């Protein structure tokens, strides 16, 4: 026989007014915050990824591949110094 954990049943939680008062504000707020985070470009700055127009510069049109196993640090330094 299974025991009782003392938690409220899920059906009671999602049918309560308090749940929907809280979540009717938080769910849209999280969506809007995420949309602003991405659309303003802050996500690119926080995670350090290049913006779509920065993948290829006018000077460097080739794909920056690391091909050497033992001199990868030197290759990486050459690629990043041109950025």
From Swiss-Prot:
GO biological process, one term: photosynthetic electron transport chain
Principal location class: plastid
InterPro entries with a match to the protein in the record: PSII_cyt_b559_asu, PSII_cyt_b559_asu_sf, PSII_cyt_b559_CS, PSII_cyt_b559_N, PSII_cytb559_asu_lum
Recorded coiled-coil stretches: none
UniProt keyword Methyltransferase present: no
Cofactor detail note: With its partner (PsbF) binds heme. PSII binds additional chlorophylls, carotenoids and specific lipids.
Cofactor(s) this protein requires: heme b
Source superkingdom: Eukaryota
Molecular function in Gene Ontology: electron transfer activity; heme binding; iron ion binding
Pfam families: Cytochrom_B559, Cytochrom_B559a
Residue positions binding heme: 23
Intracellular or extracellular location(s): Plastid, Chloroplast thylakoid membrane
Keyword Nuclease assigned: no
UniProt keyword annotations, A-Z: Chloroplast, Electron transport, Heme, Iron, Membrane, Metal-binding, Photosynthesis, Photosystem II, Plastid, Thylakoid, Transmembrane, Transmembrane helix, Transport
Membrane-spanning intervals of the chain: 21-35
Topology in the lipid bilayer: Single-pass membrane protein
CC per GO annotation: chloroplast thylakoid membrane; photosystem II reaction center
Family, per entry: Belongs to the PsbE/PsbF family.
PANTHER family from the UniProt entry: CYTOCHROME B559 SUBUNIT BETA-RELATED (PTHR33391:SF9)
Subunit relationships: Heterodimer of an alpha subunit and a beta subunit. PSII is composed of 1 copy each of membrane proteins PsbA, PsbB, PsbC, PsbD, PsbE, PsbF, PsbH, PsbI, PsbJ, PsbK, PsbL, PsbM, PsbT, PsbX, PsbY, PsbZ, Psb30/Ycf12, at least 3 peripheral proteins of the oxygen-evolving complex and a large number of cofactors. It forms dimeric complexes.
Known role: This b-type cytochrome is tightly associated with the reaction center of photosystem II (PSII). PSII is a light-driven water:plastoquinone oxidoreductase that uses light energy to abstract electrons from H(2)O, generating O(2) and a proton gradient subsequently used for ATP formation. It consists of a core antenna complex that captures photons, and an electron transfer chain that converts photonic excitation into a charge separation.
Full protein name: Cytochrome b559 subunit alpha
Naturally occurring in which organism (per UniProt): Chaetosphaeridium globosum
Gene field: psbE
